[in-house]
Amino acid sequence: MLIIETLPLLRQHIRRLRQEGKRVALVPTMGNLHDGHMKLVDEAKARADVVIVSIFVNPMQFDRPDDLVRYPRTLQEDCEKLNKRKVDYVFAPAVEEIYPQGLEGQTYVDVPGLSTMLEGTSRPGHFRGVSTIVSKLFNLIQPDIACFGEKDFQQLALIRKMVADMGYDIEIVGVPIIRAKDGLALSSRNAYLTAEQRKIAPGLYNVMNSIAEKLIAGNRELQEIIAIAEQELNEKGFRADDIQIRDADTLLELTETSKRAVILAAAWLGQARLIDNQSVTLAQ
């Protein structure tokens, strides 16, 4: 496994891979890798000749400076995990390598609509940062495939739209959420939880299951369902942030013709903002 930190070296290897006709898969990450990331790697390995994992804590997508500062950085441990998984390349650039002129005046990619709705409302600029860095990685690495987790449901939808709109010839693969045995979705931010909070954390998944059961049963009183769910979260020790029930295919409000719903949930537990989602097939 080769660790690449500079753009010239990356370009050199990408040119060689292209000349050899290799099928390349990219797994973009911000590091602090867990089993969910490893599932992305496994999916990439099954679909391509060469797997490149990027590790870059992207300052452009953080809406709070304190969150950027304390985001876990575990490059050595990450590389050890990826080496055991027989990843071919790790691209781990410094911020100065990606944004040599700094963030001020940086050209960016903005996906209208999806960037400012739902999660984008409470995190202004976040999705613009995501689409910009992903676009930059696509331009640099020129992958045939890119793998993303379905835990970040809105992010995946945004990237799919960006790829379609920008004409990228890249297959976007969504990989299902990996959960702990108690249902908690694996996330790098779970590291912020204390031992006591970790015991409480699966409550978010349980509340989503309760919402799903109501939707499957035909209940469409969405405001009431959401209000009850927020109350349940607060009673469990969370601070409910945002719960939405949307059309899974458009992320717009549910209509009578919606075939699938997605429950999008975000809640604070101590210093950790946990997000999760669950899709439900609706009775027609």
Curated annotation (Swiss-Prot):
The processes (GO biological process) annotated in the record are:
pantothenate biosynthetic process
The family database entries (Pfam families) matched by this protein are listed as: Pantoate_ligase
- Per the record's keyword annotation, is Ligase included, yes or no? yes
* List of residues binding ATP: 30-37, 149-152, 178, 186-189
Q: Which EC number(s) does UniProt give? A: 6.3.2.1
Q: Enumerate the subcellular locations listed in this protein's record, separating them with semicolons.
A: Cytoplasm
Q: GO MF terms on file?
A: ATP binding; pantoate-beta-alanine ligase activity
Query: Which family does the UniProt entry place this protein in?
Result: Belongs to the pantothenate synthetase family.
Q: Which NCBIfam families match?
A: cyt_tran_rel (TIGR00125), panC (TIGR00018)
Q: What function does the entry list?
A: Catalyzes the condensation of pantoate with beta-alanine in an ATP-dependent reaction via a pantoyl-adenylate intermediate.
Its protein name is: Pantothenate synthetase
Origin species, per record, is: Salmonella typhi
Kindly list the organism's lineage: Bacteria, Pseudomonadati, Pseudomonadota, Gammaproteobacteria, Enterobacterales
